[in-house]
Amino acid sequence: IIKVNLIGRLKGGVNTKDIALELLKKYSVKGGVGKVFEYAGEGLKHLEIPQRMTITNMGAEMGTTTSIFPTDEITKEFFKAQNRLGNFAKFVADEGATYDDEITIDMSKIIPLVACPSHPDNIADANDKKFKDLKVSSVFIGSCTNASYGDIKKARKKNL
């Protein structure tokens, strides 16, 4: 189990997919094979359920067995909004749990990233000069990693 402590808060123009891409840079497409990524830290209070889903879904790109977040008040409110509060259960790490590895990601230091062809771990800074004159003729919004109402609403505001 790899514990990923998330601290800080994402800056404008950065989203949770950038956190997942940062992890892909570190671990590659096979770095998560046979591993569980467990997310923790004070930064969780800044992540809504769809954002957490983006991170866990992107875990598959690293080959992870699974990715998990503890339940908290945000989770409880999500269940309540779905009329499923009766299904809510407390799910947190045991006191004194040990891990095979532990890393910390300061979300305030994450920059916008791009997954380039032809592998998900071919990651580049979105502001890299190689993208300066790149013309984008179409985009795809709706995958398991960016299909929440919030993602689609942002794209609409940008006229994508």
PLM-predicted stretches and their roles:
Residues I1-L160:
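Fe-S-dependent hydro-lyases/dehydratases of central metabolism
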